[in-house]
């Protein structure tokens, strides 16, 4: 029940506000979809994860995949392989 209440404003944004603007999210999944998935996985903490993601979504950030991690984290879940 609480998850549905937390997701409702995001769905409202997706349906009524987002279509009025050109796509601008630098990540996959989009920030709004990330927020929904984070809430589904982590409950109320998912809101914090979603807000942290929105703050990372700016013109100077590295675009790409940033899936919701299985464990709570406010950092980017970078799926690119890093070589050492």
Curated annotation (Swiss-Prot):
Where does this polypeptide localize?
Cell membrane
- Region (Disordered) spans which residues? 60-84
- Cross-referenced InterPro entries, in alphabetical order? Membr_insert_effic_factor_YidD
Cystine residue pairs: none
Annotated membrane-spanning segments are none
Annotated membrane topology is: Peripheral membrane protein
Return the Basic and acidic residues bias intervals. 68-84
Keyword field contains Membrane: yes
Which GO cellular component terms, listed alphabetically, does the Swiss-Prot or TrEMBL entry include?
A: plasma membrane
> Which is an annotated Pfam family here?
YidD
Keywords on record: Cell membrane, Membrane
Q: Which NCBIfam families does the record cross-reference, listed alphabetically?
A: membrane protein insertion efficiency factor YidD
The task this protein performs is described as: Could be involved in insertion of integral membrane proteins into the membrane.
Family according to the record: Belongs to the UPF0161 family.
What is the protein name given in its UniProt record?
A: Putative membrane protein insertion efficiency factor
- What lineage is this protein's organism placed in? Bacteria, Bacillati, Bacillota, Bacilli, Lactobacillales
């Amino acid at each position: 029940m609480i998850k549905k209440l937390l997701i409702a404003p995001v769905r409202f944004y997706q349906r009524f506000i987002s279509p009025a603007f050109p796509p601008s999210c630098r990540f996959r999944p989009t920030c709004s979809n990330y927020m929904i998935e984070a809430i589904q996985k982590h409950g109320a903490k998912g809101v914090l994860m979603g807000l942290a993601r929105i703050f990372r979504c700016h013109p100077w950030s590295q675009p790409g995949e940033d899936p919701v991690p299985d464990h709570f984290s406010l950092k980017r879940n970078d799926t690119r392989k890093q070589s050492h």
